Design a protein with these regions (language model features):
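Extracellular carbohydrate recognition and processing domains
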Residues: 1-19, 31, 248
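Beta-rich interaction/scaffold domains
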Residues: 49-197, 247, 267-269, 275
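Short beta-strand-plus-loop segments that form exposed binding edges in beta-rich domains
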Residues: 26-34
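Short, surface-exposed linear motifs at loops/turns and structural transition points
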Residues: 34, 187-287
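Short pre-active-site segment immediately N-terminal to the catalytic Zn-binding motif
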Residues: 349-363
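Catalytic Zn2+-binding segment of zinc metalloproteases
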Residues: 367-384
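Metalloprotease/metallohydrolase-associated module, dominated by Zn2+-dependent proteases
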Residues: 380-462
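Catalytic zinc-binding patch centered on the HExxH motif and its immediate surroundings
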Residues: 327-350
Length: 462
């Protein structure tokens, strides 16, 4: 059971517990804030479970399970559901508490698994319905689209299918439908789609990249970036529409291979499937990093340990994606007397009890100290890299180039700088290296962008 929660008030949820255990919690759906607060939590007994209640609840679960049996699902889930239904049907008023709990737990588990499988088949059916709705035998390449529709329909009837097989067929059907629409594209009305700017600077990681482009046009259906290991990629190759907005649009490519040459092109497509492409840009992804981590599980409660552990893991994932560093180990330790967090050169880190600092942004920042920011002589005592030897403008080219790319500002007023301990961009929108919990926007772009700047610092000699 669930109760919808909107504003601060008293809320309750009622349930019948036949298994001896229950999980109670909150699910945030389309939340605009970043926290949930629960106060004055009370667990109350409404009444004892009688044999009539047991039989009624079990019969309800049996009916729910049987209603699912008419729908398409994987063979294993169908068999498990049938077994669980038969087990539940054997429950009587004289059944032991253990037998009731076992039967109810089994059928609940089987129902949940069946619903997941049914949803996956329904997604395939929706893709089939969409393709059939746009199919026209009189149009170009209609035979190719129908061939893929037929394959999908056969899979829809196959209980031996797998989730991977269904997911792949949905992708194949969507690609066939796109190819069909492209083969029958018309100019449409209004201003024709056009890529007006392709930024030749691309921030690359091991499997990801950040790309800037500007497009125009009327009735735009989709804009993004496509890529391939071959020249002149199209929207029928790999493509993404995921983007960030910061003084323009930054598209975010994922799913590439490390140490690989790729060709990318921005594109814009209108609602009648006319596509315009920008200039091709060649990129080479980095080798993946080889950083590792550990957490000493020293926090006083599970929640704090989980926050710290996750922040450290995510930080090392960012470092391995964007920096290529190998041989660095981040050793995370709980510091009960540490007001915020700190890290020495080489990766010995302490995280204190303040939950605001048990976060990815803080750990990314402190790990920067672990690899040289503010802790190595190239940073704090080098006239080749610092305008004032230990502070001021960073004199390396790469860090400022990526900073200007992120801000989309290419004048002399935009450069990377810092003091003897920390670094930041001049006139920055974000504090890219997260110099304080209050500077943490909890933004993927801020984190990835900061790592791109970090990589630039390494290229410059740090």
């Amino acid at each position: 059971n669930e109760t919808t929660v909107y504003t601060p008030a008293n809320y309750s949820v009622k349930f019948t517990n036949l298994t001896g255990k229950a999980t109670i919690g909150f699910e945030a759906v389309d939340a605009t804030g970043n926290w949930l607060a629960v106060d004055n939590f009370r667990l109350g007994l409404i009444g004892e479970i009688t044999s009539d209640i047991i039989i009624s609840e079990v019969q309800r679960l049996v009916s729910e399970g049987e209603s699912l049996q008419t729908q398409m699902m994987y063979k294993a889930e169908a068999q498990n559901l049938a077994t669980a239904i038969e087990q539940a049907k054997k429950i009587t008023a004289t059944s032991t508490e253990a037998d009731v709990a076992s039967a109810v737990e089994a059928i609940n588990k089987a129902i949940k698994a069946a619903m997941v499988a049914i949803t996956e088949y329904q997604a395939l059916q929706s893709a089939i319905d969409n393709a059939q709705g746009q199919y026209d035998v009189a149009k170009n390449d209609a035979d190719k689209l129908m061939e893929e529709i037929n394959k999908a329909q056969e899979l829809m009837k196959n209980a031996e299918a797998t989730k991977t097989g269904i997911d792949n067929e949905i992708i194949a059907l969507e690609k066939a439908l796109l190819a069909f629409n492209l083969a029958n594209a018309t100019p449409g009305s209004g201003t024709a789609p056009k890529v007006t700017l392709t930024n030749k600077y691309v921030a690359t990681g091991a499997t990801q990249a950040l790309v800037r482009t500007t497009v125009t046009g009327s009735n735009i259906l989709e804009r993004g970036v496509c890529w391939s290991t071959e020249h002149n990629p199209t929207v029928l190759d790999n493509r993404t529409t995921k983007s960030f907005s910061l003084n323009g649009t930054i598209f975010h490519i994922k799913g590439m291979k490390p140490s690989t040459v790729y060709y990318i092109r921005p594109y814009v497509m209108n609602k009648t499937y006319t596509v315009a492409y920008g200039d091709e840009v060649k990129i080479v992804t980095h080798p993946a990093g080889g950083c590792t981590w550990s957490w000493n599980e020293g926090a006083p409660d599970d929640a704090a340990n989980t926050r710290c552990r996750n922040a450290i893991k995510e930080t090392i994932d960012y470092f391995n994606e964007w920096t290529g560093i190998k041989g660095f180990h981040l050793t995370g330790n709980y510091g009960s007397g540490t007001p915020t967090a700190d890290c020495s050169y080489g990766g010995w880190m302490r995280i204190g009890p303040n939950a605001a600092y048990q976060a990815i942004g803080t750990v990314l920042h402190e790990t920067g100290h672990g690899v040289g920011v503010g802790t190595h002589w190239i940073w704090n005592n080098c006239s080749d890299t610092r305008q004032n030897t230990s502070s001021g403008k960073w004199l390396g080219r790469a860090a400022t180039e990526v900073y200007q790319f992120l801000e989309n500002k290419y004048t002399d007023d935009y450069y990377f700088q810092g003091d003897k301990t920390h670094g930041w961009g001049r006139n920055a929108t974000y504090d890219w290296l997260v110099n304080g919990a209050d500077k943490d926007k909890h933004s993927e772009l801020q984190y990835a962008g900061g790592m791109c700047i970090m990589y630039g610092l390494f290229l410059d000699g740090l």
